[in-house]
């Protein structure tokens, strides 16, 4: 009887482990973006936050010489990036990320305000999961 019980438990555990591993693998995706003055940045993806940030910096440098220093990143593929650029006290851009447009905009406004920037304007939104502008 105990051997039969062990076999049943093993038979039930294997599919659960496979299901759990599949879910974890699906969540190992990070999106990152480094904004620039030309608004020509693209969203990039990687399996780690650090790798995504590094790739975003490289992608920005391929198309611009005005890349921001700090990438924005998220592992929420349903999140949104908001990109703003400011002109006072000097030209600078930043990106914020949030669960929706208003949260992302709130985040980037906070970052720029805390850094002392003013005369800022929203450049664009990007969908984290697809990279689509809008």
Task: Identify what each model region corresponds to.
Residues 1-11:
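Bacterial N-terminal signal peptides that target proteins for export
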Residues 24-134:
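Secreted/extracellular ectodomain signature
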Residues 11-14, 77:
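Low-complexity, intrinsically disordered short peptide segments enriched in small/polar/basic residues
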Residues 16-23:
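C-terminal segment of classical bacterial N-terminal signal peptides
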